[in-house]
């Protein structure tokens, strides 16, 4: 362990402030009363955070590089810092081990931290504090618009939790896109205006994404990740994510200027080989706390007020951050640790090997997975309605899907990833988070993309050699779970369509689905390990 500032530790250390890899915010609640004459900051790079799940090279690189840049900024301030580097010979490999060492060496009177984003990490650090009989002061994460307590108040007495009601309450609380107590434009939700595809002509000339060339710190991290986690999926070669606050602010400005105006209309659209489209690519910077959501939404709202971006685009973007982001955090912290065990549909199939390689004949999955491995990124429809949908229809064990999502994406922190995966994508919580399972046949993907045009499978066919696995599995899913789905009014239309199929057609679909599942089960192995 070493002090990267080169400053002497305060002789009687009042507070050791713990800063985690997703808490890179100089205005964090844990630092509000920081006194460099009495306090010190603790940060630690450990193998545990890249190996408790198989973290992709892009994900490990973004966390480690952002942490080292944050540490360098603390050094400029002259703040005492204990920083454990991953490659240090005495690194224990775990957060608990590194914190135990720091406490034993420097004997702080108290530990302080902002509430973490991972239940496992919270329990680990609490156990260390308890072992040393130290007070651990866990402060509300003021990065967010709402507290967990406020979410609990909202949830109390409700039989079902739904995003829309919580989102409206936060709009009223914050005044974002509000006018005279009413939503700007006279309605809360412009989803119906935000579902366009690119059509046969495609997206045309797209604005380039923000790219940040690796500096010396990032290059050092890239080499370390490549050497230490060579067997992990993905590549460090295309790394260009923002890893400092300055870069994150630049990425925000670029999104507002170049992509926000078209974001809403095309937020659900996909196109072969086009990774970035009109999306913000800001979720990683937000989840590392390099950006504050207030400044992000203020910039978006200003773009609407100045006539730069239409209301449906801005409202759709606001809902992702003020709505979904806050909502899933509330779900996570009010239902952990048991939430992680949910498997309402008793799905047990293994995750297919091609999720770690992209080697599949299904064009939509191949494109989404290969770009995920190359960049640590896919937009929300690719995650929900391609990789997530296939896993749901196939019947993959939701915990395996969760570990894949948590490991491969640069923006993945458990508080946001787990509810999105188990609740929204896999319906493993039985409807706690979402009002229905998000299922569709291959025709949805055909409507929203050009993937099917170059695919050997036909989205209109459920049986036969050219049958699209999405379509086959969609109908089979409806048959397998018909009794459960019949209790949900939002699924009745899909079940009526199922009931129109002749018995012999349903039998043929069930047989083909069984054959496909067996083939995927036999092909599943341990590619990532």
Regions found by a protein language model. Name each.
Residues 7-8, 20, 27, 250, ...:
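C-terminal catalytic domain of photolyase/cryptochrome flavoproteins
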Residues 2-86:
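N-terminal beta-strand-loop-alpha-helix module at the start
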Residues 44-45, 135-147, 415-423:
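A generic structural motif
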Residues 49, 172-285, 463-471, 482-529:
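A eukaryotic "domain-start" boundary segment
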Residues 62-82, 112-113, 375-399:
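Hydrophobic/aromatic-rich, well-ordered segments within soluble, folded domains that form packed cores
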Residues 27-31, 53-55, 93-96, 121-126, ...:
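A short acidic (Asp/Glu
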Residues 78-93, 354-357:
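Glycine-rich phosphate-binding "P-loop"
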Residues 94-241:
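Beta-rich, aromatic/charged-enriched effector core domains that present basic-aromatic interfaces
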């Amino acid at each position: 362990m070493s002090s990267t500032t080169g400053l002497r530790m305060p002789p009687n250390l009042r507070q050791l402030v713990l800063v985690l890899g997703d808490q890179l915010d100089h205005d964090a609640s844990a630092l509000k009363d920081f006194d460099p004459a009495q306090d010190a900051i603790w940060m630690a790079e450990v193998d545990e955070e890249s190996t408790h799940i198989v973290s992709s090279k892009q994900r490990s690189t973004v966390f480690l590089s952002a942490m080292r840049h944050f540490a360098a900024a603390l050094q400029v301030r002259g703040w005492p810092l204990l920083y454990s580097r991953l490659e240090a010979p005495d690194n224990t490999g775990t957060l608990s081990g590194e914190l135990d060492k720091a406490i034993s060496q420097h004997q702080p009177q108290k530990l302080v931290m902002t509430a973490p984003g991972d239940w496992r990490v919270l329990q680990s650090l609490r156990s260390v504090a308890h072992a040393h009989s130290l007070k651990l002061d866990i402060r509300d994460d003021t990065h967010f618009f709402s507290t967990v307590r406020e979410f609990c108040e909202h949830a109390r007495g409700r039989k079902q939790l739904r995003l829309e009601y919580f989102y409206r309450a936060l709009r009223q609380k914050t005044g974002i896109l509000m006018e005279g107590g009413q939503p700007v434009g006279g309605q809360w939700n412009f989803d119906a205006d935000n579902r366009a595809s690119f059509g046969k002509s495609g997206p045309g000339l797209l604005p380039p994404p923000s790219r940040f060339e690796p500096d010396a710190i990032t290059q050092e991290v890239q080499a370390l990740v490549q050497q230490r986690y060579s067997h992990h999926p993905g590549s460090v070669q295309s790394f260009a994510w923002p890893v400092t606050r300055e870069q994150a602010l630049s990425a925000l400005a670029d999104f507002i200027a170049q992509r926000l105006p078209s974001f809403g209309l095309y937020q659900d659209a996909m196109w072969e080989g086009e990774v970035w489209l009109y999306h913000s690519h800001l979720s990683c910077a937000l989840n590392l706390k390099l950006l504050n959501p207030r400044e992000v939404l203020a910039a978006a709202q200003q773009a609407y007020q100045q006539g730069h971006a239409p209301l449906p685009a801005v409202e759709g973007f606001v809902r992702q951050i003020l709505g979904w982001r806050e909502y899933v955090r509330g779900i996570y912290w009010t239902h952990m640790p048991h939430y992680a065990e949910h498997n309402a549909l008793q799905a047990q199939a293994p995750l297919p090997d091609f999720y770690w390689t992209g080697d599949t004949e299904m064009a939509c999955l191949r494109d989404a997975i290969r770009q995920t491995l190359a960049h640590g990124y896919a937009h929300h429809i690719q995650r929900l309605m391609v990789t997530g949908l296939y896993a749901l229809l196939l019947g993959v064990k939701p915990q395996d899907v969760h570990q894949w999502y948590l490991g491969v994406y640069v923006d993945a922190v458990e508080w946001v990833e787990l509810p999105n995966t188990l609740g929204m994508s896999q319906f493993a919580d039985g409807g706690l988070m979402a009002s229905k399972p998000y299922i569709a046949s291959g025709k949805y993907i055909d409507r929203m993309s050009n993937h099917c045009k170059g695919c050997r499978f036909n989205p209109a066919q459920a049986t036969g050699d050219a049958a699209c696995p999405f379509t086959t599995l969609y109908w089979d899913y409806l048959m397998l779970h018909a009794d459960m789905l019949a209790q949900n009014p939002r699924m009745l239309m899909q079940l009526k369509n199922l009931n129109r199929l002749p018995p012999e057609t349903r039998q043929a679909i069930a047989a083909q689905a069984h054959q496909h599942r067996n083939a995927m089960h036999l092909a599943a192995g341990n590619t990532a390990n």
